[in-house]
Curated annotation (Swiss-Prot):
InterPro entries: Ribosomal_eL37/eL43, Ribosomal_eL43, Ribosomal_protein_eL43, Ribosomal_zn-bd. GO terms for cellular component: ribonucleoprotein complex; ribosome. This is Large ribosomal subunit protein eL43. HAMAP family: Ribosomal_eL43. GO terms for molecular function: large ribosomal subunit rRNA binding; structural constituent of ribosome; zinc ion binding. A zinc finger (C4-type) spans 41-62. Belongs to the eukaryotic ribosomal protein eL43 family. GO terms for biological process: translation. It comes from the Archaea. The keyword Membrane does not apply. Its cofactor is Zn(2+). Signal peptide: none annotated. The keyword Zinc applies. It comes from Methanococcus maripaludis (strain C5 / ATCC BAA-1333).
Amino acid sequence: MVEFSHTKKIGSAGRFGSRYGRKIRVRLRDVEIKQKKEYKCPVCAFPKLKRAGTSIWVCEKCGAKIAGGAYTPETGAGKVVTKAIRRVIESKSREI
């Protein structure tokens, strides 16, 4: 019989067994799921953006390097700023 280092509910954090507490293991699982998820490259729109290091994301197709969040290529705050900039640009283009 093969023993697995993860469980159905906790996923990859099952490797820690009963150590460190449930909340921490659940948070770790959520972070690891976000890290491993496939993201689209903002340059070529190909879904092969991978995490190379802390806040460094590299496209496997075009080789573009992007600075983003630690666990996702774009943070929540980054999305808010991008929307605000887009609104300002649109309002200026309407005035002209």
